Regions:
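Conserved catalytic or regulatory cores that recognize and/or transform ribose-phosphate-containing ligands
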Residues: 1-83
Length: 83
């Protein structure tokens, strides 16, 4: 926690960009500090696919999870991806 605010990292497939934004907004209004993904490779952010970038972003996401008090999994229709 930071002061009285729970820190939550969002996890899930970047296919669901709109759902990430919806959940981020809701949790923020509930008084949480929300950490989310910075790019949505499956939703149009082509920079993700440059050599080395995807690996860096995956590692950064793990560090975001390390910083959080808890995670929130965005699981649209039960989809969890191929990994």
């Amino acid at each position: 926690m930071v002061k009285n605010y729970k820190v939550i990292t969002l996890c899930g497939s970047t296919r669901f960009k709109e759902q990430f934004f919806e959940v981020q907004k809701r949790l923020t209004l509930e008084g949480c500090i929300v950490i989310s993904v910075g790019l949505f490779g499956h939703s149009g952010d082509e920079e993700v696919w440059k050599p080395g970038t995807k690996e860096m972003l995956d590692d950064m996401h793990k560090r975001k999870i390390d910083m959080a008090d808890e995670i929130f999994v965005i699981n649209v229709g039960g989809y969890i991806g191929v990994r």
